[in-house]
Amino acid sequence: MSAPAQNYKIADISLAAFGRKEIELAEHEMPGLMAIRKAYGDVQPLKGARIAGCLHMTIQTAVLIETLVALGAEVTWSSCNIYSTQDHAAAAIAASGVPVFAWKGETEEEYLWCIEQQLFAFKDNKKLNLILDDGGDLTTLVHEKHPEMLEDCFGLSEETTTGVHHLYRMVKEGKLKVPAINVNDSVTKSKFDNLYGCRESLVDGIKRATDVMLAGKVAVVAGYGDVGKGCAAALRGMGARVLVTEIDPINALQAAMEGYQVVTMEDASHIGQVFVTTTGCRDIINGEHFINMPEDAIVCNIGHFDIEIDVAWLKANAKECINIKPQVDRYLLSSGRHVILLANGRLVNLGCATGHSSFVMSCSFSNQVLAQIALFKSNDKSFREKHIEFQKTGPFEVGVHVLPKILDEAVAKFHLGNLGVRLTKLSKVQSEYLGIPEEGPFKADHYRY
């Protein structure tokens, strides 16, 4: 494939000015990314990096992209979801000169086309040498269709739980060809983005889509991992009566100890009025469950892919489907009752709203930037010696790695000032007593926060 005829394809370039205003607002709420620009801008640690990114093309992602560029990288971009692009964000990034191929409401074919287009949009027909992914679609495409691009690739960083599961499967099957950093399992990602991000953005998506009163409703949350915990807390905070389904006895016990009733989907499907899937698995809600649901049950997903809900069964077996408004469809079933599907079974917080807030995404994206630096500089011993926070980041073998604790703690520190947090300092005596450095890291890698 030759280089694209133009260096972007988006919905409307005239939205760029609007997008730029929102990017400027978001920058104030993303202190981690701004601190990284300040700390490493003069060093240009990503000079020479060519990063292909596949992640929701939102305002917050625009700040991430411009941070990578500010550190010296050349970047191309596509979205990792057909509904999640904010068109004004894509326009602002395109207007800044970054090749971006994304718009809200892509077809499946257009989605794959966009991912492939970005691979051939680097200057002088050069190939990528870093991948920044969310969900694994870009990683899979390059490994399966363009393996020659991996020859000079320093590695990849993966944003989300689903993509990390895919990476470990690739390792097991011997298919992963470059080092990968699991950004999702950084504490400042999984315990913040997954938990606190979902705690706010889930309800935002449901409310914008349906205007439903959640107080008093029976809400069913499938899965009680970090995402499920945030969703359950949000729904309970709105006054809903929350049921949880789980396969893992530890997570089930956690849910029970928090006061949630843990049931099976078979039982919950008869009484639930709002259903949220958070598992990263498939077939969580199937045809049998749809038939059992009460009138106008609301069904949505906040996991990465659309296979948690059997949307194909719904489309094949419904007597009628009426589109109420974008991303809100009402299906008539053989039971004579209706179900309301949000975002076509894809991410409800991005399909029906604008996703997580800027502040929590700053935590996640700070990890992404540090991961990209760690990969690109993994063989640069002088850089790692000068910047002690990167001493333990390389060289990397092919496999899946996590960022060291010192970088995780650094991300947290970047965000404390905006919240008015003042840290207590260890004394020398206390440091010696605990056996940890005065400046950290403060916890062992196995510590569970």
Swiss-Prot record:
Residues the record lists as Phosphothreonine modifications: 393
EC id: 3.13.2.1
Domain of life: Eukaryota
Pathway: Amino-acid biosynthesis; L-homocysteine biosynthesis; L-homocysteine from S-adenosyl-L-homocysteine: step 1/1
Keyword terms of this UniProt record: Acetylation, Hydrolase, Isopeptide bond, NAD, One-carbon metabolism, Phosphoprotein, Ubl conjugation
Pfam families given in the database record: AdoHcyase (PF05221), AdoHcyase_NAD (PF00670)
Cross-link Glycyl lysine isopeptide (Lys-Gly) (interchain with G-Cter in ubiquitin) mapped to chain: 21, 413
Gene Ontology CC entries for this record: cytoplasm; cytosol
UniProt-listed SMART domains: AdoHcyase, AdoHcyase_NAD
Record-linked NCBIfam families: ahcY, PRK05476.2-3
Protein purpose: Adenosylhomocysteine is a competitive inhibitor of S-adenosyl-L-methionine-dependent methyl transferase reactions; therefore adenosylhomocysteinase may play a key role in the control of methylations via regulation of the intracellular concentration of adenosylhomocysteine.
Protein name in UniProt: Adenosylhomocysteinase
Organism of derivation: Saccharomyces cerevisiae (strain ATCC 204508 / S288c) (Baker's yeast)
Taxonomic path: Eukaryota, Fungi, Dikarya, Ascomycota, Saccharomycotina
Gene: SAH1
